[in-house]
Amino acid sequence: MVRQKNRYLLCEIIYIDGRRLHRNLQQRDIYHCVRNALAKEHGEYGVALALRSLSIQAYFHPNIVMIRVSRDAHKMLQSALFFIRKIGQYEAFFNTLHISGTIRTCQKFYVGYLRRELPKLLRECKTPEEEKEVKKAISSCVPVEVT
C-alpha cells in the first residue's frame, strides 16, 4: 500500500474588526467556507482533488486551525484561502503561518507559536474567565482539539 502524502497548513483566522479572542465558530463553518472557496476558484476539479484528504482541526488557541490536504492540492488550497473574506457569520480571512509535510513538525511550530503569542493574548483579556483560560493554555502549551 502506498502512503498518501499530505501537506499541513497552520493558519490563523484574523477577524476584520480586530478582535483576537474566541468566537463561536464551528469547525463545520470553516470546512464549508474552505470547500466553497475551492469550488469558486478551482471548480469541481479543485474540490475533488482536495476533498480526498481535506481535514480541518481547530485548536484551543482561539484563531488557529490546521488544515490537512493532499500534496497535489495544497497550492490550490492556498490560492483559495486568499479569497476567503467571510467565515460563518464573521468577516475574517486566513493568514497562513506554516506549511509542513508532517503533522509533527506542524505541531512543533504551533507549540513555539503559542509560547510567543499567548502572553500577548493574556494582556488583552477583559474578564477573569478569559484570563483563566489563557493561563491554562500557557501552562499546558499543548494543542487541544475543539469539538
What is each of the regions a protein language model found here?
Residues 78-81:
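Short active-site loop/helix that positions an aromatic residue
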Residues 68-75:
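Helix N-cap motif at beta-to-alpha junctions
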Residues 59-66:
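The conserved glycine-aromatic submotif of the RRM
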Residues 10-12, 66-68, 95-97:
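Beta-strand cores of modular interaction/reader domains in eukaryotic scaffold and signaling proteins
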Residues 91-105:
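Conserved beta-strand -> loop -> alpha-helix junction used to position metal-binding or nucleic-acid-contacting
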Residues 83-92:
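A common structural junction motif
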Residues 1, 13-57:
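Surface-exposed, low-hydrophobicity interaction/linker segments
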Residues 1-2, 10, 101-147:
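C-terminal low-complexity, charged extensions that often adopt amphipathic alpha-helices
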